[in-house]
Amino acid sequence: KIDERNFDSLMERLLSEDGIFIVDNGASSFVPLSNYLIENNAIGMLQEAGRDVFIHCVVTGGQALLDTLSGFKALAEQTSTNNIVVWLNEFFGAIEHNGKAFNEMKTYAENASKVRGIVRIAKRNPDTFGRDIEEMASRKMTFGEVIGSSDFSIMAKQRIKTIQKDIFAQLDEVGF
């Protein structure tokens, strides 16, 4: 069990230090961190202190679609920010339910006012792009680290650059 009081030191840093912060938490800490942020009105506190808060939420296709849609819905309903960036990850399948795309779903329609933007990670060839991304992720490398690494072939780097350009262009559209 995660002691949510430990998030206090994170909040201290977010409030006292300058710069851009990215809090990348995994599935095991998602619920405790969400509870902490909501119960303590932490997002409101950060905004009152002049901090811009963006929450990135992943919705993934395939078997986890309904669970990740439920997570998005809960997050949107429980937070006061209108700066949610939804990442639609098609790696495990299309983001589609009962013949409807994400932006046609009731869950999205009811919470669209909370969404700052949507970034789509398109399903690509799993033998090339998929393996390159898996390798990058397993090594916990950034796009720049892969591109500068001698461990990746020229074509693997080209595929990584293609994905990077696509994602960065979509992030530019979100307008941070």
Segments and roles (model prediction):
Residues L14, V59, L171-V174:
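Generic structural signal for hydrophobic core residues of well-folded globular domains
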Residues K1, K114-I118, K140-T142:
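Active-site regions of enzymes building and remodeling cell-envelope glycoconjugates
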Residues N6-S9, P32, N41-A42, K100-E104, ...:
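Exposed alpha-helical structural elements
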Residues K1-F30:
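Nucleotide-state-sensitive switch-loop elements of NTP-binding domains
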Residues E134-F176:
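NTP-binding/hydrolysis catalytic cores, primarily Walker-type P-loop NTPases
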Residues S29-R131:
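Conserved catalytic-core segment of NTP-binding enzymes
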